[in-house]
Amino acid sequence: MDKKETHLIGHLEELRRRIIVTLAAFFLFLITAFLFVQDIYDWLIRDLDGKLAVLGPSEILWVYMMLSGICAIAASIPVAAYQLWRFVAPALTKTERKVTLMYIPGLFALFLAGISFGYFVLFPIVLSFLTHLSSGHFETMFTADRYFRFMVNLSLPFGFLFEMPLVVMFLTRLGILNPYRLAKARKLSYFLLIVVSILITPPDFISDFLVMIPLLVLFEVSVTLSAFVYKKRMREETAAAA
């Protein structure tokens, strides 16, 4: 076995170890969340007038596992980000390592901010609008599975989408992206974000519109922040070359 193959095996072993640590953290958070899942459930349905219905015993377990899984994913993000950083850190320069480490806490904060926006802002508005449509015409009954799927579909994607500005800033700082590339890709980006907004919302124009606007705003914020970071990086490179 030559030196190159030994080096590759070492990298794969390190990657395997980082993945195992991340998965172990996820399952630990999953078990912890499941122990408190009834309290989480009660908190999430605190504003409902009645109880949610279930169509079978297995649906109860499915709902509890879904709620526990979402909590575990949220709690595992800092662990996954840190393990990824530890894996790529040896290949980075001292400046790149410093920049990368600075962005990890921000990823978790923006993920929570995105979920909070989806849950506290979008979800009540869309739910109220849709239930208002049935007022006086239909007997509304929510099943636990449908209710929480609807909640997750509106909230969880925003957890990841809210990270877009920070990811763009990070890639701009490393020289992979710049505001000019983002501006050229604006039409394509708008199209993709509109498709995402349609996929994660119920099939009505109001819901699509309410989700579409924040996504487009996030993209424009990303372009603006990219321009700020790009100018700062250019000034630093000019000063270093002088």
Curated annotation (Swiss-Prot):
Pfam families: TatC (PF00902). This is Sec-independent protein translocase protein TatCd. It comes from the Bacteria. Its main location: membrane. GO terms for cellular component: TAT protein transport complex. Keywords: Cell membrane, Membrane, Protein transport, Translocation, Transmembrane, Transmembrane helix, Transport. Belongs to the TatC family. B.subtilis possesses two minimal, substrate-specific, Tat translocases: TatAd-TatCd and TatAy-TatCy, each one composed of a TatA and a TatC protein. TatA is bifunctional and performs the function of both the TatA and TatB proteins of Gram-negative organisms. It is a multi-pass membrane protein. It is found in: Cell membrane.
